[in-house]
Amino acid sequence: GQTVWPDHDMFHSSDTICGSLMARSKAISGGPVYLSDSPSDFIPDNILPLIDESGKIFRPSAPAIPTLESILTNPLQSGKDYRVSAPTGDEAVSIICYNLNTSPIHKEVKTFVSPKDYLVPKRTTGYFPADSILVFNWKKQTAEILATDKEMKLKGFTDCLFHLCPIRQGWGIIGIQEKYLSPATVQLLSRTNETLTLNVLCAGTLRIWVESQGKQELRSILIKKPGKIEISK
């Protein structure tokens, strides 16, 4: 198991350039979260997606690491995207794609997410093959089947957070959409072809992908308090 967890250092939630970017980097790093703002300057929109109502941090199952093609990349000067991934929750993999280039020449870079991004972490986390892979764009709050590489552009000093969620027995479990690490907000208790039982760890909007009788649906379920929930197709 993981014996050392990194400390990703402090950040300012009120930083107008990269406050939200740094918050997401803290989330996927798995390290502690601490702020350098004056409390009067705290930006709740950047802080609350990190934690539950009691202040407990939603963490990945292991610290994020660079994806294979990013290991030897200088993210500030390469002119390329920089990507990191971490296993999250019971079954998902979370990925952040960055444009961290400081030169105006590289104001826009191409990046991607791939079904292969889900396959790499399974070697160490015990994941097993899925029927298909769902990709959830956290910023846009949209989901789609990821059958091939999905390319996009990152404009400016920015990032994009994705969750790759396996679809098994017609269920794709995303989690609470308001939290950065959505898959870490739920625990899978049981799953059949007809029902899904979860332990939801915080209030918010639960997003579940459902496939039944040839139809696909991205459901939004309002969760008012943490606890066990059973969902039927």
At which residue positions do the language-model features occur?
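Carbohydrate-binding surface patches
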Residues: 26-29, 34, 72-131, 161-168, ...
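Generic, well-ordered alpha-helical scaffold segments in large soluble proteins
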Residues: 27, 31, 50-54, 138
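Contiguous mid-protein beta-loop-alpha structural module that forms a pocket-lining wall or clamp
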Residues: 135
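Glycan-recognition surfaces
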Residues: 1-44, 65-70
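Active-site-proximal helices and loops of the catalytic beta/alpha 8
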Residues: 46-65, 69, 125
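A general structural signal for short secondary-structure junctions and capping/turn motifs
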Residues: 14-19, 23-27, 49-50, 83-88, ...
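C-terminal beta-strand-rich structural cap/linker in extracellular carbohydrate-active enzymes
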Residues: 145-188, 206-208, 215-233
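Flexible loop/turn segments at secondary-structure boundaries
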Residues: 11, 34-35, 41-45, 67, ...
